[in-house]
Regions:
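His/Glu-rich zincin catalytic helix
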Residues: 1-60, 168-243
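Charge-rich, well-structured scaffold segments of protease-associated domains
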Residues: 5-7, 55, 61-210, 243
Length: 243
């Protein structure tokens, strides 16, 4: 795993981000350990990010970090997922929690089903967001096969197919240290910080390269234009260029 430490002498805040190269476009791949070819529903990377905070004892790691006075968050993009926090105090307590929850996923039939309702509501909110709809429709006009045209959160239909087994399969494939990067910035002694990070990491075998499979995309656009009616005070438009 790549660990990048950026010392900032006398900096008040400390910042850490831990990311994995697993995003919404990674929906077809070959597992490196088994050679199994896997297709997953749209929205799994985002769904997995949401579920990482829940603990077996019923607590939530975001709440735990907030109780320490730490500003924590996570996000998913087309090509990666990241977990992060910033703080002025309690950095090492926050580091304990971050490394613990990212290394110990907890997925059950019950908590996965519950999350489907929560993410379904989130998808509905984005369906009503003019700016997001503008962007997604532009992607749909430009691309025919590339999964970048699909919403990062997936659809209500696609997330209904997500199971604990799917989540664990993706976690075990993409959350391997060989596929992850950590960046830390603040007033640290790099050698000491690196030692503290390594003490907390679970040693895993390097599983080898993950073979991602992407559909062949033609140079031609999918459609020239698309118009959608929504309640707005001013019209919105977006011009896309397919490279």
């Amino acid at each position: 795993m790549d660990i990048i430490i950026i010392p900032k002498k006398n900096a008040i805040k400390k910042y850490i981000i831990w990311g994995t190269h697993f995003g919404s476009i990674d929906n077809h791949f070959i597992m490196p350990n088994t050679g199994e070819e896997v297709y997953i529903p749209d929205g799994v990377a985002h769904f997995l990010e949401h579920k990482m905070f829940e603990q077996p004892d019923g607590t939530n790691s975001l709440d735990t970090l907030m109780a320490l006075g730490i500003d924590a968050n996570a996000y998913t993009t087309n090509d990666h997922t990241a977990y992060l926090f910033e703080c002025t105090d309690n950095f090492y307590e926050g580091l304990d929690e971050l490394i613990d929850y990212v290394q110990h996923p907890y997925f059950t039939e019950e908590n996965v089903e519950k999350e489907k309702g929560i993410i379904g509501q989130e998808i509905g909110m984005y369906d009503d967001d003019p700016g997001w709809q503008l962007y997604m429709n532009a992607m749909d006009c430009m691309y025919k096969e590339n999964p970048i045209k699909i919403d990062i959160a997936g659809t209500v239909e696609s997330i209904s197919k997500i199971t604990p087994d799917v989540l664990y399969k993706c976690y075990n494939t993409f959350y391997n240290p060989a596929n992850m990067t950590m960046v830390v910035c603040g007033d640290f002694e790099p050698e000491k910080l690196l030692e503290e990070i390594k003490k907390r990491l679970i040693k895993k075998e390097n599983q080898g390269e993950i073979k991602r499979i992407y559909a062949k995309e033609e140079k031609e656009i999918n459609q020239k234009e698309k118009e959608v009616s929504m309640e707005l005070s001013n019209p919105l438009f977006l011009i896309g260029y397919k490279d």
